[in-house]
Every structure is written in structure tokens, then in C-alpha cells.
């Protein structure tokens, strides 16, 4: 009376790995290095021994039903290598400790600690970069050294800049005429402060007589220059050619700061109509330049100009003025 329904039967399909479940190292290469400490990334299942060798910075854990994930436990990148290569975030290393940019069988991932890329706030690279940047022959990028030093000398922990300054002082006291010492002196000047001024002056005063004669004439002027400076209101650093053309890194602090006292001059000269004969000439002085109708503007030697003025002035007879003073005093006494 009744009817029935019979469905055809078929054997279930065999298990087959998919691209989502099978571990595939090449597909993980771009994702895994960026995983941060304590974070995980799913990798599928059945990770072979090559996976553990390729990613020694990770623990391999089973999540569920044979599916696995990698969990970062450390950063194994060499600190020195990572500190001196700002753009390097990770690399691959073989059994002979050779470094490569690309993965190949037998190589292991080495990731740089993110703190090696934040030299503005991290102190992880300070000791390494102090030693490397001190050595002019180390091959380290000087631009990177300058960037790092700008941060390191301003660390909240004052023991860090003190340690750096002590090491640079020891080196530069023996000779400051090199890029390493000039960069350091430059940063101390930028930071400023009495303490840094004292450090700079201490180093410069320990230079050899030959160094001072060649590079520090502004700070050690001749007797004639001192004689002129005593008779001029404007700071000597503003007109002494030895100061104007000097290397500011090799100026003692007093001379360096006096440069900020110099005035800026602006001259406007306008002549609408001027008739002169062939025997006449016009010379106009505008601060540090002489402007002539016959010559192009020429820079004037200020020191010589001041010396000429003093030489052409009359000599003061102090004895004569003293006698006059006594006579005036006696007359006033008699009148009173």
C-alpha cells in the first residue's frame, strides 16, 4: 500500500588539505616577521620539522582539531646588526651565520627587536652606537650617528649623556680635528647650557699649541688684536677676521656666545643724479663694504679699518689734562 524512497549511495570524499589548512612556509614569509611579542598567527596544520627550524622565535601550538598557530616568544635578531641598519626589520640566517634577504631551505628567521628602530626613546642601541660612532673607521653611517646622538645626549636618565660625554672627552682631548669630534661638539652647542659649555672648553683647552695656532686664533688673539678690541664697543668676534672665518666648533664658549651679540646692518644708498669730473671719485662706506664709482664692492678688513681710525686720531696728553683739572679745582675752591 505504501511507497518508499531509495536514495543512491556514494562513498564520502577522501580528506584533502586545502590552502587554508596546509602549512606553507613561502606563504607565511611576509606575515610572520611582523607578528609582535605575545601575538599569534594561524598556520594550518601538520607543521613539519622545517617550520620549527625556520621560525625559532615562535612556539608552535595546536589550537583545535589538528590546527596550529605560531606564537612569538622572542626576537633573535643580532642587536648590533639591527641597530646599525635602520631599515632592516628582519633577515634570514643559515647554519654558518651568514645573512640573507630571502628565505631558503635551512635558513632561520631573525627579527629585529622593535626597540632597535626607536632610537628616539629607546636606550637599547646606546652602548653599541656610542662605540661605533666613536670610531671613524667603523663604517657606520654618520647621518645615523648624528640622529642618534641628538636623542642620546637628551636622555632623561642623565647617566647616559654623562657616559657618552666622558668617552668623547677622552677621545677628543687628544685631537678634535676630525668628523667624530666635530659632530659631538656640534650637538653639545645645540643642546647648550653651562655644563656643556664647560665640557667643550675643557676639551678645547687640552688641544696642542699647533692646533690652537691653526684653528683657535679667535680664542687666542694676538696682542695687536687685543689692543684694538679694548678700544671698540662692538664685540671682537663681530669684526675680527679670525673669528668671522673660524670653525665655530673650535671656539671657546665665550667667543661662541659673543657671536650672538653682533648686529645685522642693512644699508640703502640712493643717488638720483651725480656729476663728477675725471679727477674725482666717490667712496661710500656701508658697514663692512666699500662702494666706489670705479670699483666693484669690496669687503673691508674691519680690524685694519679700526686700526686706521685709531692711528689717525690725536694722542691724548694726560699730563696736560691733569694740570687743567687741578687749576679748575683751585679756582672753584677760591670762588666758593
Curated annotation (Swiss-Prot):
Residues 1-22 are annotated as: Disordered. The lineage of its organism: Viruses, Varidnaviria, Bamfordvirae, Nucleocytoviricota, Pokkesviricetes. This is Protein FPV127. Belongs to the poxviruses A16/G9/J5 family.
Amino acid at each position: 500500500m505504501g511507497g518508499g524512497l531509495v536514495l543512491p549511495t556514494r562513498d564520502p570524499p577522501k580528506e584533502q588539505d586545502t590552502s587554508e589548512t596546509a602549512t606553507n612556509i613561502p606563504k607565511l614569509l611576509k606575515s610572520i616577521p611582523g607578528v609582535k611579542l605575545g601575538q599569534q598567527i594561524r598556520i594550518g596544520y601538520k607543521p613539519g620539522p622545517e617550520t620549527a627550524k625556520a621560525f625559532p622565535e615562535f612556539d608552535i601550538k595546536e589550537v583545535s582539531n589538528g590546527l596550529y598557530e605560531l606564537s612569538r616568544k622572542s626576537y633573535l635578531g643580532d642587536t648590533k646588526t639591527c641597530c646599525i641598519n635602520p631599515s632592516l626589520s628582519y633577515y634570514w640566517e643559515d647554519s654558518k651565520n651568514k645573512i640573507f634577504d630571502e628565505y631558503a631551505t635551512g635558513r632561520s628567521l631573525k627579527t629585529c627587536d622593535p626597540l632597535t628602530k626607536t632610537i628616539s626613546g629607546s636606550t637599547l642601541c646606546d652602548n653599541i652606537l656610542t662605540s661605533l660612532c666613536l670610531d671613524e673607521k667603523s663604517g657606520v653611517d654618520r647621518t645615523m650617528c648624528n640622529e642618534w646622538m641628538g636623542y642620546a645626549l637628551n636622555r632623561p636618565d642623565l647617566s647616559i649623556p654623562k657616559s657618552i660625554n666622558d668617552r668623547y672627552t677622552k677621545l677628543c682631548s687628544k685631537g678634535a680635528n676630525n668628523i667624530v669630534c666635530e659632530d659631538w661638539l656640534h650637538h653639545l652647542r645645540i643642546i647648550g647650557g653651562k655644563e656643556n659649555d664647560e665640557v667643550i672648553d675643557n676639551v678645547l683647552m687640552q688641544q696642542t699649541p699647533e692646533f690652537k695656532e691653526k684653528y683657535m686664533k679667535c680664542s687666542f688673539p694676538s696682542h695687536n688684536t687685543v689692543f684694538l678690541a679694548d678700544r671698540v664697543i662692538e664685540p671682537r668676534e663681530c669684526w675680527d677676521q679670525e673669528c668671522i672665518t673660524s670653525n665655530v666648533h673650535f671656539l671657546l664658549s665665550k667667543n661662541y656666545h659673543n657671536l650672538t651679540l653682533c648686529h645685522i646692518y642693512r644699508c640703502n644708498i640712493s643717488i638720483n643724479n651725480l656729476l663728477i669730473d675725471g679727477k674725482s671719485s666717490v667712496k661710500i662706506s656701508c658697514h663692512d663694504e666699500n662702494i666706489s664709482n670705479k670699483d666693484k664692492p669690496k669687503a673691508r678688513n674691519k680690524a685694519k679699518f679700526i686700526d686706521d681710525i685709531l692711528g689717525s686720531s690725536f694722542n691724548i696728553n694726560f699730563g696736560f689734562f691733569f694740570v687743567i683739572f687741578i687749576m679748575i679745582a683751585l679756582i672753584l675752591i677760591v670762588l666758593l
